Curated annotation (Swiss-Prot):
GO CC annotations, alphabetized: host cell nucleus
E.C. number(s) listed in UniProt: 3.6.4.-
Amino acid composition bias (Basic and acidic residues), ranges on this chain: 679-694
Family: Belongs to the herpesviridae helicase family.
Protein name per the record: DNA replication helicase
The encoding gene: HELI
Region (Disordered): 658-694
Record function comment: Component of the helicase/primase complex. Unwinds the DNA at the replication forks and generates single-stranded DNA for both leading and lagging strand synthesis. The primase synthesizes short RNA primers on the lagging strand that the polymerase elongates using dNTPs. Possesses helicase-like motifs and therefore may act as the helicase subunit of the complex.
SUPFAM superfamilies hit by this protein: P-loop containing nucleoside triphosphate hydrolases
Gene3D superfamilies to which the protein is assigned, alphabetical: P-loop containing nucleotide triphosphate hydrolases (3.40.50.300)
InterPro entries for this protein: DNA_helicase_dom, HSV_HELI, P-loop_NTPase
Residues the entry annotates as binding ATP: 120-127
């Protein structure tokens, strides 16, 4: 068909949504996946395949010591590469120098497994198959990336206590394993113990052993941790109790059906690692799955042509990190003959064809050709010309500011942010603010790291230079380097934490501590997989504080890199949107069941604070006030009794009246209305005041309008005369909380309908800002401050799968966020820890918890806790790399491929273009299809062959 047909002939308005029709048409075949998975998961391994103690024998490794270096040298000289698994590999295991652990591969059994391949175009419905599997089967759902895992959590509507995890966290990977996996020395050493060369991997047994060797430093560390814990449990209790404790270590003990999303980002050997740990944990815990001899069934979901799996190596001596393209799991299952035959891929491949994220037919046809590597037609190339815009426009931050910019490299993203910040400083300086990022370095651990990395070095490298060179590794999320960071790093010495605590009052309240609206547990904070950490640290040694500053833009589009703890404290949006949320119970419905009471309490607090707006809106007249006073106010026993007691009390103490309607006091100059942005730019403050919570005092002798209003019952809101501020949830039963919520909601909706009728519908379009039981002040530096010095709300989490708007920051105490003081140096706590405030798509405001992370470095077989960083865990959605955008759906996209892009690949083009949900909102600086690019030709023949194979399950 013609690629321009849609532009020449207008299409009739469909009766049903296109996405709905496409999903319904594929539903029947998606259900067949369940039957296929059931069949694969019934496989059993033979009882003689494993002895009960197999995990003990394979974990025993030989280590050399400094006392006998000749033995290591002799063993290394005799180590040879064999074409089969033999006892000589075990002898070679004792040859390891430098403390790197190597396995005794002659004792390894073969770990059988089954695999199902699920691939398809971007937005074609692969996630739908995961939803169906989760609904119909008992399976372990995971993702390769944090974004993929959190996206699945949202789609599957998982509760806060059952969030989807990454596959790495499921099998026990923690931050200390990052340097173990990247160590160049370890990988060079382990290469000597491969049972054969890659081209000689003619059997699945050889392939499995070589793949496990590639990841052995991490495997060995996790295995040792588990075995040590098992032995301690067995020594203090019974073997059965130890096995039961081990069974709770990993979700891999829950089911033999393991679903992994975005497998195109996972290296080939990780498939065998997952299989290994499935057997390890189940054998260690003697689980039902192990006793029934269940073979693991791995469901690999993703696209082999969208992105690449990257392999990284880090050299401590040169401090260089090399990154190269590796073979991902999906490509291996499609191309590797050994895996194809063993997994019977021809019969176990499900392929989704059409794009449902963007239902434009011409655009979908183009993406289909790009996904499968089919040679493009001339009309495809010509079709992309329509998206080209001048490069100067895309690189100009003021042009189409609402569009997300995508670039090939981090350098280009940094350059764009610098241009953006410079432009904002000239026109909207009040939108810029910067916050400190702290790094507390343990001097003793850093000194030891330098000695291990360079034993012959005269003096250690300056710590601030090391910090700058390793910033992307220390701040463990890739997009951190894209932010506009200060070039200057301040360095200062810190006293030992114990001395600081002894000097100051030890009972000082921790920042962020205190009472909690949601309870004392503080939510489901993800902790390390193993609590007993053998990393070397020196808590009482001297420490160095490194500080740099990071610049943010108020109103910019942002995301988070991982599930971050947050507190919902308010709402900011239009009155109409807030009413829609109330009528549909949107916030209540999206809240997990165990938090229902807290959700009702929070929305009740927002409604209480928002009631003032009916009396102070720009459209309010005396006639409207009379009508508002007639709205029925039902009795709420928990609120009215306290109000009656207050009314019976003497006159207002200190001249404070709960009916003060002091709102936006600095909002005018000379009787003229001044825009909020202009007031903020002139250093003034915007106040959102709740009458009965106001602490405003005016010492002037002049009689103000507010004082005159106090004597006029017309301007006294009967709502605040009848009801007091809602108490905390701990003082109310669930029934009382729900009754309070429904009463406030009904009053608000009645008032809204009245105002709509009297204003001709204009009231709905007004902006509404309301905070939970608090008055707030917006300061000129983007700081949001509570007049009580604290915020209270509902503990929740923000997800990397969602996009948020940055509203500013607060330095006030957040009562609902548990304290992190025990993880942060007390001198850093004393300086005050600011928290960012985000707004989600519905308009709810979140206070984001600070991100505290420990950086553990491994060198010469020793793990060192070198430093702890305190930052904000934020990534920008205003601009990002194309690789980072993988898995996201973006409304408006502007892609900059550069002037003369090098190493441009079809995967880059495909991922960048397929992020958009509507091609009308896509622009690019060039037509990348007219430039030289690397084609995905290697995998195309396999995909084309599968499309023609009747055994392949095709879902359109």
């Amino acid at each position: 068909m013609s690629m321009t047909a849609s532009s020449s002939t207008p299409r009739p308005t469909p009766k049903y949504d296109d996405a709905l029709i496409l999903n319904l048409s594929s539903a029947a075949k998606i259900e067949r996946i369940v039957d296929k998975v059931k069949s694969l998961s019934r496989e059993r391994f033979a009882p003689e395949d494993f002895s009960f103690q197999w995990f003990r024998s394979i974990s025993r490794v030989e280590r050399t010591t400094d006392n006998n270096p000749s033995a290591a040298t002799t063993a290394a000289a005799t180590a040879t590469v064999h074409s089969s698994v033999s006892s000589s590999a075990a002898a070679a295991a004792s040859s390891e120098a430098g403390g790197t652990r190597v396995p005794c591969v002659d004792r390894w059994p073969f770990f059988p497994f089954r695999a199902l391949l699920v691939t398809g175009t971007a937005g074609a419905g692969k996630t739908s198959s995961i939803q169906v599997l989760a609904a119909n089967l008992d399976c372990v759902i995971t993702g390769t990336t944090v974004i993929a895992a959190q996206n699945l959590s949202a789609i599957l509507n998982r509760t806060r206590s059952a969030q989807v995890k990454t596959i790495y966290r499921v099998f026990g990977f923690v931050s200390k394993h990052v340097p173990l996996a990247d160590s160049a020395v370890s990988h060079e050493t382990l290469e000597r113990y491969r049972v054969c060369e890659p081209h000689e991997e003619t059997t699945i047994q050889r392939l499995q052993i070589n793949d496990l060797l590639a990841y052995w430093p991490v495997i060995a560390d996790i295995v040792d941790k588990c075995l040590n814990m098992w032995e301690r449990k067995a020594a203090s209790a019974s073997a059965a109790a130890a096995a039961a404790a081990c069974e709770d270590l990993s979700e891999l003990c829950e089911s033999n059906i393991i679903v992994i999303d975005e497998c195109g980002l996972m290296l080939r050997y990780m498939l065998q690692v997952v299989v290994f740990f499935y057997y390890f944990y189940n054998a260690l815990g003697d689980t039902r799955l192990y006793r029934e001899r269940r073979v693991p069934c791995i469901i690999c979901v993703g696209s082999p042509t969208q992105t690449e799996a990257l392999e990284s190596r880090y050299d401590h001596y040169t401090q260089n990190k090399s990154v190269r393209k590796g073979v991902d799991v999906l490509s291996a299952l499609i191309q590797n003959e050994v895996l194809i035959n063993y997994c019977d891929i021809a019969d176990n491949w499900v392929m989704f064809i059409h794009n449902k994220r963007c239902t434009d037919l011409d655009f979908g046809d183009l993406l289909k050709y790009m996904e499968f590597g089919i040679p493009l037609k001339e009309e495809h190339v010509a079709y992309v010309d329509r998206f080209v815009r001048p490069p100067s426009s895309i690189r100009n931050p003021s042009y189409a500011a609402e569009m997300t910019r995508l670039f090939l490299s981090h350098v280009e993203v940094q350059a764009y942010f610098k241009r953006l910040h410079e432009q904002i400083r000239l026109s909207e300086r009040h939108r810029l603010f910067d916050l400190p990022v702290y790094c507390v370095v343990n001097n003793r651990a850093y000194q030891e790291l330098c000695e291990l990395a360079d034993p012959l070095g005269d003096s250690p490298q300056p710590v601030e230079l090391w910090f700058r060179q390793n910033l992307a590794r220390i701040i463990n999320y890739s997009q951190f380097v894209d932010h506009n960071l200060s070039s200057e790093i301040t360095k200062e010495a810190l006293r030992p934490a114990a001395d600081v605590v002894a000097t100051n009052n030890p009972s000082v309240q921790a920042h962020g501590g205190g009472g909690s609206v949601i309870g004392s547990t503080g939510g489901n904070d993800e902790t390390a997989f193993f609590q007993d950490d053998d990393t070397t640290t020196a808590p009482d040694s001297r420490e160095t504080l490194l500080t740099l500053r990071i610049t943010y833009i108020k109103g910019s589009s942002v995301g988070v890199n991982s599930k971050v703890r947050a507190c919902v404290i308010g709402y900011q949006g239009t009155v109409e949107r807030f009413v829609d949320i109330l009528q549909k119970d949107t916030f209540i419905e999206r809240t997990p069941c165990e938090q229902a009471a807290y959700a009702y309490s929070l929305v009740s607090g927002l409604l209480f604070s928002a009631m003032y707006y009916f009396y102070v809106s720009p459209y309010t007249t005396e006639e409207m006030l009379r009508e508002l006073a007639r709205v029925e106010l039902p009795d709420v026993s928990s609120l009215c009794a306290a109000a009656a007691a207050t009314a019976a009390a003497p006159a207002w103490s200190g001249g404070e009246n709960p009916i003060n309607n002091h709102v936006d006091a600095d909002s005018s100059q000379g009787g003229q209305s001044v825009p909020v942005s202009q007031r903020m730019e002139h250093g003034q403050e915007e106040t959102h005041d709740i009458p009965c919570l106001s602490n405003h005092h005016d010492d002037s002798d002049a009689i103000t309008d507010a004082e005159l209003m106090d004597h006029t019952s017309l301007y006294a809101d009967p709502f605040f005369l009848k009801y007091v501020k809602p108490p905390s949830l701990a003082l109310l039963s669930f029934e009382e909380t729900v009754h309070m919520y429904t009463t406030f909601r009904d009053i608000f909706l009645k008032r809204y309908q009245l105002m709509q009728r009297l204003t001709g519908g204009r009231f709905a379009t007004l902006p509404l800002v309301t905070y939970n039981r608090r008055n707030v002040v917006f300061k000129a530096n983007c700081q949001i401050s509570s007049q009580t010095g604290s915020f209270v709300g509902m503990l929740s989490h923000v997800s990397p799968a969602q996009t948020y708007t940055l509203e500013g920051y607060t330095s006030d105490n957040v009562l609902s966020l548990p304290s992190d003081r025990h993880r942060i140096h007390p001198e850093v706590v004393q300086r005050g820890l600011s928290r960012l405030v985000l707004r989600d798509a519905l308009g709810f405001l979140f206070v984001l918890d600070v991100n505290v992370s420990r950086f553990v470095e491994s060198a010469q077989g020793k793990s060192l806790h070198v430093c702890t960083t305190v930052d904000y865990g934020l990534t920008s959605r205003t601009a990002m790399t194309i690789a980072k955008s993988q898995g996201l759906s973006l409304e408006k996209v502007a892609v900059d491929f550069g002037d003369h892009p090098k190493n441009l690949k079809m995967s880059h083009i495909y991922v960048a273009m397929s992020r958009v949900t509507d091609p009308e909102h896509l622009m690019m600086n060039v037509n990348p299809l007219r430039l030289p690019y690397e084609k995905n030709t290697a995998i195309t023949p396999y995909i084309c062959r599968a499309l023609k194979d009747k055994r392949t399950t095709l879902i359109f």
